[in-house]
Amino acid sequence: MIPRYSRPEMANIWTDKNRFRIWFEIEAYALEAFEKQGLIEKGISNQVFEAVGDKKYDFDVDAILDIEKTTKHDVIAFLTYLAGIIGENSRFVHMGMTSSDILDTALSKQLDEACEILIDDLKRLLAVIKKRAFEHKDTICIGRSHGIHAEPVTFGLKLARFYAEFDRNLARLEAARKEIAVCAISGAVGTHANVAIEVQDHVAEKLGLESETISSQVIPRDRHAMLFSVFGVIASSIENLATEVRHLQRTEVLEASEFFSKGQKGSSAMPHKKNPILTENLCGLARIVRASVVPAMENVALWHERDISHSSVERMFAPDATVTLDFALNRLINVVENLLVYPQNMQKNIDQMGGLHCSQRVLLALIEEAKISREDSYKIVQTNAMKVWEEGADFKSLLKNDPLVSSKLTDEKIDSLFDDSHHLKSVDKIFDKVFK
């Protein structure tokens, strides 16, 4: 996590101050539950809240870290620091609890807060893609398979595909958020022997989390693995859209391009350059997010009721993945919103192949109307198509001058096979399905 690829809204979730605030709230809400159980006198939790007051937003991080140098234990260091603020009531804090009750519940809360931001990012991205998709619903361009001209699509359809992909990602993230947003206050090995289930339920409700069904010393890591897997899928979708823009911005294609601002420079050596730097950057950032997926999977298999092998990994990749993904989504929003589209170049690229994009329509006409076998029809069409590739001839003219075709299809029929509106006849229905 570096400032260059961070937004403060997300980065602030992972600050020490925010982490210690959540730790305090977990401990204080547990005191409320202890009062309800009659384990401590009523009013103690209020005394603790009042003693801390607004300090919970501004705990002395350096002081806590100094204590940790001695304790070699972050939670004990925090509890020692907290005791200095709340005094005698500190003896009731953390009763029957273990460090993972604090660490895991806090991590769940941080990931829940991160998901809230990411869900908003996705909704804003979807709105921008939808707007541009309708803007170019009927903007015809060539579709490509294997990088080679295939048949026409519309630029709006391209964007509609990405809309549907990110809409699926939104549903995945909402489901994964629900799965990760859990609280576990279950004690040393998850048995609730020394801290009642009701304490966990109360803290969960106060934090806006669900109460974990069953835990060991830790929240099961399959929950985290699911969330980071979804992060990886979203990152791949970002790269998918970014790669499309990069290809379309190639000089010999130039059907769309990133906005190039006044004063922007593309190369220190070549003043003419306008490079797709934002989408290239997004492809790189996607790799960072995906790099968290395998470690998250490997964290699932902890020893018995818990070992600490997951901890160092999560301290690194939880902030890195969420901050990077948030930045990437916001950069992608900017790219799509300001994307330059060149319909004239799209038509020019269609025309440069001499009508080959209509080869399937000719094939089907020979099969269905001329009653020629599929094998023979394919051979006739391919023979003429190869002349276009090799000689630069016009496909339609070749067909009209081929006796095998002209004896079966009239010139008017052949002309109709090159009407590109045929390729757009289902666009409205597709849009209705995507944007229903």
Residue ranges and their predicted role:
Residues 157, 225-233, 361-369:
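Short, well-ordered beta-strand elements within core beta-sheets of diverse protein domains
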